[in-house]
């Protein structure tokens, strides 16, 4: 009966949506100073996921649009982005004049919030990572590519595994959202990365601070929202192919992509492969078993019509990383089983398969819209220790995600959104070894948000209620069964004061919530690659936090600057602490503890343009994480990133040439300060000295008859081959070198990279 009611409801909504009248929008885009037409300008409707590119005469046409009020975004590299509200009931023609700008703080639409909103009107800090930034870097994985953004760090284990950290918090405090659903892949583990093909990601939004309002539990630190490429314009079919090479670990990467739009029938398919042998540094030489292999297949097929869109997204991601053990010979060299140039991981290694199917829908209902997303994920994570034939550890996780929200018509200037969302999970242990108990989980949340423009002011607020039920299964002599229920009320209120066209002040107060994960509650075992034996606590309480954000930004033709400050007080903050003198099978024992925590810090960025086309970009980020009232050795929260200063000098050689376009050269100083604020109790962690890395890069697009047909990028990271250890590298705690008494394995040395992208 319930199923029939649901089917009737969906059919009625579909009929209502189909009744929408369609319209067409066209226009011309020119340069404000010269009046010349601008080709290659991206015109995009974020709510509708539709767009187009301007032709050689600067003209564009987008058809099959619903007659609604929505937002349009117009952007071109080297020019100020325009974001404007538009009523498609009355507007049929709309021209734009783009102003050339050196400023990096341009206006964009943020879709990771409740509905769409401009970055200018977001009271909480948001970082936008553009396609140009992603393509212009040499990275081992997606999170590695994001880790140079202010306030973002990564926990690494070897060459191919990275976990995001936002403002000093990671693991289950940072959500990764892709294809509209939260990524679920056993993210409680140190050596469990993010199972996403980096080539399938076109742009990224990084929401800093508690985002529990939209996403529920686990968004205490923030959210990383991954976006694929927009649906191609009507009648367009495109093919892209890319290849890259990196010298340090011999990385070879290939990707092929095809996409198209025929009368609203859209598709986008991609295949990717990446292999790397052991990386090297000047202290350790080749680091045995730091190699990895990666493959990915993803596809989208669906309809984009006047009533909205309905897309089915399918993906498979496979990763086989070697696990660095860091054992050493008497002469201090790392124990190796081959010459380090093989692309096949040796024992121990992981084998990760992540399957995902997402049905993503957006229906236009009168002046409002309904967004409905349902997803299924299967994560199979196997670890081979003694034999390549049978895994010792074998995790199988099933997840069903759901998210529905309704964006009501604007009423007296108020924009309201109401929604529900949550997930169901079932996890099982299929191997002989176990670390966590098998479990079932279900959570659900409901929320409402509102915002309004009041002249120079923009205000927003929201509230959410969450409930999570978790039941673990007993295993004789290892795990006792337990049932837990976690309830949380979260919310936020914020305001922005526009100080004219170029500057803004913002203030936001938010309440965060996070239920303990299964590892914190029930773990009991040693995981290869973590160098420790972890013991959970089934009596842990959920984390609650209050965070205050304050910010200021300014942007002009020659200067852009942004300052974001925060202070966060978290109750029942969960962390790992080493039990002094306690070991299990020679592995040190770490137990999950909790208590009051205070985190504060921020990010400051300044981009100065002393002459035309010259960018001098500086970004400084820091966080201080303490446990109030605790003695010095246990005063600081463990594994907090060190302060960091990124300084980049970039010159745009050619911006709009007939053959070469967007041509640049860049030099960067990456200064990671010493981290002496450590959790020293029980030897949990050690201090890390500071280091400076020098990076160079260059890139250009190639044009043929006004269209970009290829892009080339060259990079040189750690040019001086500096020997260093990141404070958040798990390999920092590998075995001690008997020759010099230094513990752990060092990070990669000099790395030269080349990347070529072809477009048809």
Q: Which positions does each model-derived feature cover?
A:
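Hydrophobic loop/turn residues within beta-sheet-rich immunoglobulin-like superfamily modules
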Residues: 65-66, 86, 99-101, 169, ...
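Outer-membrane beta-barrel proteins, especially TonB-dependent receptors
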Residues: 112-129, 133-137, 144, 156-169, ...
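Bacterial Sec-dependent N-terminal signal peptides
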Residues: 1-26, 43, 760
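Short, acidic Ser/Thr/Gly-rich low-complexity loop/linker segments typical of extracellular
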Residues: 48-59
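Short solvent-exposed capping/turn motifs at the termini of beta-strands
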Residues: 23, 29-33, 56
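Short, acidic, small-residue-rich periplasmic hinge/interaction motif at the N-terminus
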Residues: 28-34, 41-46, 73-80, 89-135, ...
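Exposed aromatic-hydrophobic patches
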Residues: 59-64, 95-97, 699
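Short Pro-Gly-centered beta-turn/loop motif in secreted/extracellular proteins
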Residues: 35-39, 61-69
